[in-house]
Amino acid sequence: MGSNKSKPKDASQRRRSLEPAENVHGAGGGAFPASQTPSKPASADGHRGPSAAFAPAAAEPKLFGGFNSSDTVTSPQRAGPLAGGVTTFVALYDYESRTETDLSFKKGERLQIVNNTEGDWWLAHSLSTGQTGYIPSNYVAPSDSIQAEEWYFGKITRRESERLLLNAENPRGTFLVRESETTKGAYCLSVSDFDNAKGLNVKHYKIRKLDSGGFYITSRTQFNSLQQLVAYYSKHADGLCHRLTTVCPTSKPQTQGLAKDAWEIPRESLRLEVKLGQGCFGEVWMGTWNGTTRVAIKTLKPGTMSPEAFLQEAQVMKKLRHEKLVQLYAVVSEEPIYIVTEYMSKGSLLDFLKGETGKYLRLPQLVDMAAQIASGMAYVERMNYVHRDLRAANILVGENLVCKVADFGLARLIEDNEYTARQGAKFPIKWTAPEAALYGRFTIKSDVWSFGILLTELTTKGRVPYPGMVNREVLDQVERGYRMPCPPECPESLHDLMCQCWRKEPEERPTFEYLQAFLEDYFTSTEPQYQPGENL
């Protein structure tokens, strides 16, 4: 296979078959809720897909909220840090310039890096057009490298590979190659399959490395390169569930920021187009930045929070990067404060659950959404950060049931008396752990409590927690040991997980790392006999 191929960007993109095998060696045969958005075109960047390589911009070391802003903060990557002075790269996706200083390019184009490969935006020279400008570093990979192959998805998890492959539109044999989660230096081939008993499912094959540098799935059939292995199995199943037919489609990743040095931006660069929702402290809009880029814009009412405190916190928030967190792009730091983030096409999870689509969601989809949220929060946990306002209204939904955590960290900055009293009308008491509501002790463990409440929102399709109870009553009852009963049709094992999140002593509550693992393996380890019901 040619090594200049890159991943397709959109599920709608025409899928390509693999080229014939070559030189095969070896024997062998076989806060701010957003409402459901209007039907509008998606942003140019797409909304889904594994995060790609980037190196965070250099920053002044500053400890803030337990988070060291000089740390390198990354989510699972397609390509790792670069070594060996590689300067020629190949474009993995099309990119349309957003400013006068960045560079448009097409997928497959070869680019010469002009400056060093640090930061999120690199100065590059196109070998096709002769033009020079800044490019998003996660849209390119070193020429003739494994990262430049369209089927190579890098450091994504087994569960994430299954999310991508279990699309009903994918034919049998749709595949990707990823890093092994369990064996350092090894890879995994993930392939979609179908049978009458299991329906659509995914098989995973470990690709082992020879001491000589070659690769094999079965020792009788060995290859000099991963490219040769993929090309061979595209012609011969040879023990696999099916021959490899089509590279798994995915969307372009978000760029890291809107453009080089586009952090504090002028208000005039934003156009507010469609109002998506309104909360106690502001509004949410779909809009455009610089006339080129689809974004979501939160506008805060003057007096909601101190601009100075917000800007300080935002410097930390923008370094939190994970594929299950809504990315903070830019800010307008003078009042009224504007917060510019990636746009999520399906709006808030709360509205999504209560809407038309919610009726058709069953437990497997709901548990998967919960696992995605837990994955984002496990990253927040690793970064020693605290969300403080985790609930369905602050989760955003994109295409293919992708869920991302939004509004992390903002709640701490709100200066409204009805909120800071913690028992005022604007405070989300029903989602808040007792030690946080009563004594202001907000930690990642109070976020775990809130996650347990969010699980009830998922399993009841958006019902308000503690139905029939007012805030003051909820606080009193919970302090006396009351916990919500198991929702109708919800398995006891899932209710038991909720109750673990609601343990009185914060340190006895599970970690988000545990919650993620439990939910990702739920239908294999906990409820293998699950059968769909009327609502779940």
Swiss-Prot record:
The keyword Protease does not apply. SUPFAM superfamilies: Protein kinase-like (PK-like) (SSF56112), SH2 domain (SSF55550), SH3-domain (SSF50044). GO terms for cellular component: actin filament; caveola; cell junction; cell-cell junction; cytoplasm; cytosol; extracellular exosome; focal adhesion. GO terms for molecular function: ATP binding; ATPase binding; BMP receptor binding; cadherin binding; connexin binding; enzyme binding; ephrin receptor binding; heme binding. The keyword Transmembrane helix does not apply. Disulfide bonds: none annotated. Phosphorylation by CSK at Tyr-530 inhibits kinase activity. Inhibitory phosphorylation at Tyr-530 is enhanced by heme. Further phosphorylation by CDK1 partially reactivates CSK-inactivated SRC and facilitates complete reactivation by protein tyrosine phosphatase PTPRC. Integrin engagement stimulates kinase activity. Phosphorylation by PTK2/FAK1 enhances kinase activity. Butein and pseudosubstrate-based peptide inhibitors like CIYKYYF act as inhibitors. Phosphorylation at Tyr-419 increases kinase activity. Gene3D superfamilies: Phosphorylase Kinase, domain 1, SH2 domain, SH3 Domains, Transferase(Phosphotransferase) domain 1. One of its GO terms (biological process) is negative regulation of protein-containing complex assembly. It catalyses: L-tyrosyl-[protein] + ATP = O-phospho-L-tyrosyl-[protein] + ADP + H(+). Residues 1-53 are annotated as: Disordered. The modification Phosphotyrosine is found at Y187, Y419, Y530. It is found in: Cell membrane; Mitochondrion inner membrane; Nucleus; Cytoplasm, Cytoskeleton. The active site is at D389 (proton acceptor). PROSITE patterns: PROTEIN_KINASE_ATP, PROTEIN_KINASE_DOM, PROTEIN_KINASE_TYR, SH2, SH3. Residues 84-145 form the SH3 domain. ATP binds at L276, G277, Q278, G279, C280, F281, G282, E283, V284, K298. Keywords: ATP-binding, Cell adhesion, Cell cycle, Cell junction, Cell membrane, Cytoplasm, Cytoskeleton, Disease variant, Host-virus interaction, Immunity, Kinase, Lipoprotein, Membrane, Mitochondrion, Mitochondrion inner membrane, Myristate, Nucleotide-binding, Nucleus, Phosphoprotein, Proto-oncogene, SH2 domain, SH3 domain, Transferase, Tyrosine-protein kinase, Ubl conjugation. Pfam families: PK_Tyr_Ser-Thr (PF07714), SH2 (PF00017), SH3_1 (PF00018). Belongs to the protein kinase superfamily. Tyr protein kinase family. SRC subfamily. It is linked to SRC kinase activity has been shown to be increased in several tumor tissues and tumor cell lines such as colon carcinoma cells. Thrombocytopenia 6: A form of thrombocytopenia, a hematologic disorder defined by a decrease in the number of platelets in circulating blood, resulting in the potential for increased bleeding and decreased ability for clotting. THC6 is an autosomal dominant form. Affected individuals may also have bone abnormalities and an increased risk for myelofibrosis. The SH2 and SH3 domains are important for the intramolecular and intermolecular interactions that regulate catalytic activity, localization, and substrate recruitment. This is Proto-oncogene tyrosine-protein kinase Src. The gene is SRC.
